[in-house]
UniProtKB/Swiss-Prot annotation:
CDD domains: HMG-box_SoxA_SRY (cd22034). It holds the Pfam family HMG_box. Residues 60-128 bind DNA. SMART domains: HMG. It is found in: Nucleus speckle; Cytoplasm; Nucleus. The keyword Cytoplasm applies. It comes from the Eukaryota. The gene is SRY. GO terms for molecular function: calmodulin binding; DNA-binding transcription activator activity, RNA polymerase II-specific; RNA polymerase II cis-regulatory region sequence-specific DNA binding. Transcriptional regulator that controls a genetic switch in male development. It is necessary and sufficient for initiating male sex determination by directing the development of supporting cell precursors (pre-Sertoli cells) as Sertoli rather than granulosa cells. Involved in different aspects of gene regulation including promoter activation or repression. Binds to the DNA consensus sequence 5'-[AT]AACAA[AT]-3'. SRY HMG box recognizes DNA by partial intercalation in the minor groove and promotes DNA bending. Also involved in pre-mRNA splicing. This is Sex-determining region Y protein. Keywords: Acetylation, Activator, Calmodulin-binding, Cytoplasm, Differentiation, DNA-binding, Nucleus, Repressor, Sexual differentiation, Transcription, Transcription regulation. One of its GO terms (cellular component) is cytoplasm. It comes from Gorilla gorilla gorilla. Residues 175-204 are annotated as: Disordered. The lineage of its organism: Eukaryota, Metazoa, Chordata, Craniata, Vertebrata.
Amino acid sequence: MQSYASAMLSVFNSDDYSPAVQQTIPAHRRSSSFLCTESCNSKYQCETGENSKGSVQDRVKRPMNAFIVWSRDQRRKMALENPRMRNSEISKQLGYQWKMLTEAEKWPFFQEAQKLQAMHREKYPNYKYRPRRKAKMLPKNCSLLPADPASVLCSEVQLDNRLYRDDCTKATHSRMEHQLGHLPPINAASSPQQRDRYSHWTKL
């Protein structure tokens, strides 16, 4: 018995569990003694039984409200009557039916929900509702994949062409205004050639 105790003490005091020390312990005792050590990351987790993924509060469900209390049986009934109806459509129908109920018809379900909430507060006094963050949806025109170099080059060329056409249009328009500003004003005494020339420039 003394040799077993000294062997166990040397094992827990050493950082590496050497095979020589483990051989001094019987097989059935060694398996039961090291079961917790091998499965847990630390002695604290083995003693307390806590899970590293989260506390118990993260797994606690919210207390049901009046609508959920009412819709439990109604949803089951509607699903049995309409086996091909989708769950989303059932939810829409239940929401519409709930709105059509009077306050007197809703009141028993509000009372039941208040009782459930009181029981929930008593059972989980430190409970706080933490809604899950929804993943941000990317816009339809936004993509994480890199754009094709050929398409980028093509779009740049098209943009340059548009800018070039706009610049040419502005330059032509300003040049025409400049030329029209130097034309003599047309009047009734002007010759037919002058009137034709003026109409030609104004049509451009």
